[in-house]
A protein has these predicted regions:
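Buried, small/hydrophobic-residue-enriched core segments of structured protein domains
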Residues: 1-96, 111-116, 148
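Gly/Ser/Thr/Ala-enriched C-terminal appendages of enzymes
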Residues: 62, 77-171
Length: 171
């Protein structure tokens, strides 16, 4: 639904459990690839069993042009994802002619961690944030309908019609 509403192709992001079940990252990536529709862009998690860069190169060789990106999610027990790791991955991927493969990082990301990567101009294409968002303080809000097809309407107790909300986007 999100991809249809935004007019973008969907992408699939491989979970940690898949390589664990198949016992091999490349085998898991191939199964992941085989069961996704061709319109779904593939992002494969690496580093479950071995070196992130080495696994990324093996996955890239296996999926070639069908691979949109690599996701690195190195646990904090191993130092987490570092800018040096991302720089090495990009350089090695470029050397092997996988310039089209994007790099995504995840794992304990906070605004400060993301800023660190940005300030160093690290070649990260996207950040997948989970626990920082899910652990955030509640933000009470309502998603009231105030207008339908240019007709002002609202539930009892609310003022119908458009709001002058500069931070609101029409969907």
């Amino acid at each position: 639904l999100g991809s249809r509403q935004s007019g973008r192709n969907p992408f699939g992001n491989m979970p940690h459990s898949l390589p664990l079940i198949f016992g091999d990252t490349v085998a898991a990536a191939q199964v992941f690839d085989r069961h996704l529709g061709m319109e779904v862009q593939r992002i494969v998690l690496v580093g479950t069993f071995g070196d992130e860069v080495e696994e990324a190169l093996k996955v890239s060789q296996a999926l070639r042009d069908k691979l949109r990106g690599i996701r690195i999610d190195t646990p904090s027990e191993r130092g987490g994802v570092t800018p040096a790791m991302v720089d090495e991955l990009r350089a090695r991927m470029d050397q092997m002619n996988f310039r089209h493969v994007e790099i995504y990082i995840s794992g304990g990301l906070t605004p400060d961690r993301i800023k660190e990567f940005q300030d160093l101009d690290c070649p990260v294409n996207g950040y997948l944030v989970g626990s920082y968002i899910s652990g955030a303080s509640p933000n009470d809000f309502t998603a009231d309908i105030r207008e339908i097809e240019d007709k002002a309407i609202a539930k009892r107790g609310r003022i119908p019609g458009k709001l002058d909300g500069p931070r609101l986007d029409r969907i």
